[in-house]
C-alpha cells in the first residue's frame, strides 16, 4: 500500500511503499489490509519504532565489524558540526516564524582557568548558532546567596531558556542547593534531581538529559550502532557521566553493568561488553586486553600525560589506550575529537529544546512524526489531530497556517487530508 508524501512548497513527492520495504512489510503484513483506498490499523509501539528506524535518514554510516583492520574512528567533531548546523537552521526558522531567539545564561564563580575556558567556548558556540548568551561572573569569595539570587533572576527572565552553573563551585558553597535552585524547565544541564529521577524511571521522560551522556548515545545513533539487546559496560559511576550514561543505555534496552573502584575483576567484566563507555579520568586504563573483538568504545576521559615532543609539554589521552584498543574494537572515539565536541553540541540542542517547549514551537518534521504515530495507533485520533492543526492550534503560527504543510493521497490520486 503506497502512501505519497508531498510538501506543497515543492514539486517533489516521496513514495513510501510498504510492499517493497521487505523487513517492515514482513513485520506488519498482518496489520495492513490491501486496498486501493487508504486504510490504517492500530499497531504496537514496537512496530512504530521499527518504522521510525527504517525510515530514518539521519545516520552517517553503518559501522561494520571487521577484525582484520583497525577500528573505525567515530568522528565527534563531524557529528557535533552537523548538530550545530541543524540547531542553527531551527533557530533561524524559530526567529522568522514566531520572533523568538533561544537564550542561555551561564554563572561562573571564581577564577579557575579551565572553567573560564569552558565558559568562553560555550559562549562562542552559542554565537555560532544564533543563541543569545548571558554571563554572570562572581568572585571566589561570593556567597551562596548571591549565586541563588542570580539563578532566581534568570528563572524569571522570559528571554532565558537555559541556565547553567559552571562546576565545580567553591568549597564553601553547597553544590546541590545551587543546582536544585535552577528551574527544572530551564535545567539544560540535566542535573536537577527531578530530571535525573525521571531518567531513572520507566515510562517517564526527563525534560533534559545531561549533555555528555546524551552526546555518547547520539554518537552511537548517528553511526547506526545497535544498542538494543547488547551488553554494555559503563566504567565510572559519577552523577555527571557514568550514572546517567548507564540509565540511557538501559532505556535503549541494553544489558548494563557498571564498573567502579570497588569492582572485582573489572577486566573480565569489561571484556564481555559489546559497548564500553569509559568515564573515570585515568589515562590509558582500559587496555586492548580488556576489549572484546568487535566492541564499540566511547571514551569520555580527557587526561594530560607528559610529552616532551609537544610544545605544551603534554598531550591529551583518554581512559582507553587507543593504540591497543583500536586493533581489537570495531569502532572507537578518539581523544581529543570524540565525545568532547558533543558535550557543547548537546548543550545547544537542549537550549533550543527548552525554547521550543516553552513557546510551543514545532518543526514540520516533528508534526509529521507525531501525526504518523497517531495514524498507526488510531485513524480517528489522527483526523482529530489534523483538524486541530488546521483550525486553531497550528504549531508554526498564523503565517504558516496560510500554506499547506503536506498532503496525503490514496492510490487513486485523491487527496485524503490537507494539512495547513
Segments the model singles out, each with a brief description of its role:
Residues 69, 74, 161-231:
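Anion-binding alpha/beta catalytic cores of soluble intermediary-metabolism enzymes, centered on
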Residues 47-98:
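Positively charged, low-complexity intrinsically disordered leader regions
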Residues 1-41:
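N-terminal chloroplast transit peptides
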Residues 109-124, 203-296, 300, 305, ...:
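Glycine-rich phosphate/diphosphate-binding loop of Rossmann-like nucleotide-binding domains
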Residues 146-158:
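Short, well-structured alpha-helical segments in soluble
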Residues 178, 196, 301-358:
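Rossmann-fold NAD(P)-binding glycine/threonine-rich loop
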Residues 408-409:
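Intrinsic disorder/low-complexity segments
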Residues 104, 126-140, 256-257:
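Short beta-strand elements in bilobed, periplasmic/extracellular small-molecule ligand-binding domains
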Amino acid at each position: 500500500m503506497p502512501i505519497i508524501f508531498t510538501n506543497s512548497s515543492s514539486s517533489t513527492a516521496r513514495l513510501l511503499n510498504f510492499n517493497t520495504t521487505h523487513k517492515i512489510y514482513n513485520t506488519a503484513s498482518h496489520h495492513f489490509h490491501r486496498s486501493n483506498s487508504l486504510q490504517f490499523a492500530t499497531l504496537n509501539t514496537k512496530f512504530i519504532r521499527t518504522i521510525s528506524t527504517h525510515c530514518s535518514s539521519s545516520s552517517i554510516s553503518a559501522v561494520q565489524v571487521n577484525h582484520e583492520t583497525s577500528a573505525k574512528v567515530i568522528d565527534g567533531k563531524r557529528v557535533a558540526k552537523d548538530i550545530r548546523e541543524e540547531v542553527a537552521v531551527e533557530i533561524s526558522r524559530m526567529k522568522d516564524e514566531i520572533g523568538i531567539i533561544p537564550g542561555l545564561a551561564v554563572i561562573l564563580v571564581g577564577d579557575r582557568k579551565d572553567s573560564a575556558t569552558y565558559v568562553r567556548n560555550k559562549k562562542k558556540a552559542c554565537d555560532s548558532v544564533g543563541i543569545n548568551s548571558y554571563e554572570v561572573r562572581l568572585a571566589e569569595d561570593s556567597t551562596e546567596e548571591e549565586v541563588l539570587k542570580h539563578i532566581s533572576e534568570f528563572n524569571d527572565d522570559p528571554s532565558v531558556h537555559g541556565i547553567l552553573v559552571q562546576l565545580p563551585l567553591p568549597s564553601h558553597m553547597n553544590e546541590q542547593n545551587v543546582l536544585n535552585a535552577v528551574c527544572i524547565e530551564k535545567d539544560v544541564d540535566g542535573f536537577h534531581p527531578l530530571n535525573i529521577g525521571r531518567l531513572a524511571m520507566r515510562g517517564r521522560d526527563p525534560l533534559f538529559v545531561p549533555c555528555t551522556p546524551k552526546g555518547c548515545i547520539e554518537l552511537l545513533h548517528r553511526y547506526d550502532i545497535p544498542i538494543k539487546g547488547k551488553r554494555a559496560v559503563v566504567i565510572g559511576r559519577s552523577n555527571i557521566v557514568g550514572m546517567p550514561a548507564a540509565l540511557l543505555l538501559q532505556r535503549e534496552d541494553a544489558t548494563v553493568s557498571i564498573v567502579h573502584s570497588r569492582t572485582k575483576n573489572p577486566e573480565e567484566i569489561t571484556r564481555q561488553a559489546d559497548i564500553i563507555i569509559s568515564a573515570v579520568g585515568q589515562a590509558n586504563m582500559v587496555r586492548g586486553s580488556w576489549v572484546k573483538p568487535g566492541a564499540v568504545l566511547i571514551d569520555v576521559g580527557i587526561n594530560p600525560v607528559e610529552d616532551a615532543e609537544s610544545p605544551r609539554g603534554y598531550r591529551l589521552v583518554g581512559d582507553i589506550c587507543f593504540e591497543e584498543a583500536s586493533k581489537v574494537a570495531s569502532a572507537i572515539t578518539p581523544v581529543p575529537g570524540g565525545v568532547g565536541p558533543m558535550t557543547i553540541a548537546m548543550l545547544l540542542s537542549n537550549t533550543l529544546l527548552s525554547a521550543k517547549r516553552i513557546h510551543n514551537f514545532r518543526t514540520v518534521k516533528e508534526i509529521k512524526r507525531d501525526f504518523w504515530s497517531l495514524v498507526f495507533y488510531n485513524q480517528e485520533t489522527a483526523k482529530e489531530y489534523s483538524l486541530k492543526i488546521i483550525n486553531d492550534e497550528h504549531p508554526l503560527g498564523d503565517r504558516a497556517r496560510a500554506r499547506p504543510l503536506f498532503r496525503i493521497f490514496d492510490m487513486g490520486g485523491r487527496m485524503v487530508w490537507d494539512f495547513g
